[in-house]
Curated annotation (Swiss-Prot):
Homodimer. Its EC number is 5.3.1.6. Keywords: Isomerase. GO terms for molecular function: ribose-5-phosphate isomerase activity. Pathway: Carbohydrate degradation; pentose phosphate pathway; D-ribose 5-phosphate from D-ribulose 5-phosphate (non-oxidative stage): step 1/1. SUPFAM superfamilies: D-ribose-5-phosphate isomerase (RpiA), lid domain, NagB/RpiA/CoA transferase-like. It is an enzyme of class 5 (isomerase). GO terms for biological process: pentose-phosphate shunt, non-oxidative branch. It comes from Streptococcus pyogenes serotype M12 (strain MGAS2096). This is Ribose-5-phosphate isomerase A.
Length: 227
């Protein structure tokens, strides 16, 4: 599995050229993309500026010598490469297994080309087998948890050891065990309108390409263009 993740990450790095501002994703597959960019910066003199999606990725990129800028200092990003926890046939996805969904979505939004790197196990018919992360403010989190519980969403607080995990943005994550999300777009809108929810892990209609690595090789799936 790790070998497939590495293949997907390295393949995505081929889309990066001199002068680009690139979004650096978070997670076990995006890790290999960042590593390959670091190698190219060092060995090939690749000239890029990175924008990171988590403190973990910032630390990795700094260690590799990749120049970084804050999201607040740029107007657009040429290319962002990130992982995904599930991707359906309509190019909707669930992200946030690494607890970085808010920053990942903030970086994805001004991106001209958004690429996900996955192994074949992440491609699914319907989203929802992977728990859906919902980032919530700490104030009122337990009340919101009860709302989700009453709605039948089977919520659980993301933990780190014996304590609730706190994200880079100082929020909690409530994971929803939904089984199958029949209409990801509608459910995303529902969560968007829920007071106390900062962001959720449904990335609907955002991705442009999905690089899928399997034992049979690598395929690049292109999302249909809107309109």
């Amino acid at each position: 599995m790790e070998a497939l993740k590495k293949i997907a990450g390295v393949t995505a790095a081929q889309y990066v050229t001199d002068g680009m501002t690139i979004g650096l994703g978070t997670g076990s597959t995006a890790y290999y993309f960042v590593e390959e960019i670091g190698r190219r910066v060092k060995q090939e003199g690749l000239q890029v500026v990175g924008v990171t999606t988590s403190s973990v990725t910032s630390k990795q990129a700094e260690g590799l010598g990749i120049p970084l800028k804050s999201i607040d200092d740029i107007d657009s990003i040429d290319l962002t490469v990130d992982g995904a926890d599930e991707v359906d046939k309509d190019f909707n996805g669930i992200k946030g297994g690494g607890a970085a969904l808010l920053m990942e979505k903030i970086v994805a939004t001004p991106t001209k080309e958004y690429i996900w790197v996955v192994d074949a196990s992440k491609m699914v018919e319907h989203l929802g087998a992977f728990k859906l992360p919902v980032e919530v403010v700490q104030y009122g989190a337990d009340r919101l948890f009860r709302v989700f519980e009453k709605a039948g969403y089977k919520p659980s607080f993301r933990m780190k050891g014996d304590s609730r995990l706190v994200t880079d943005m100082q929020n909690y994550i409530i994971d929803l065990d939904l089984g199958c999300i029949k209409d990801p777009v509608a459910f995303g809108h529902l969560l968007d309108g829920t007071v106390g929810v900062v962001e959720h892990g449904l990335f609907n209609g955002m991705v442009d390409k999905v690089i899928v690595a399997s034992k049979d090789g690598v395929i690049v799936l292109e999302a249909p263009k809107a309109g």
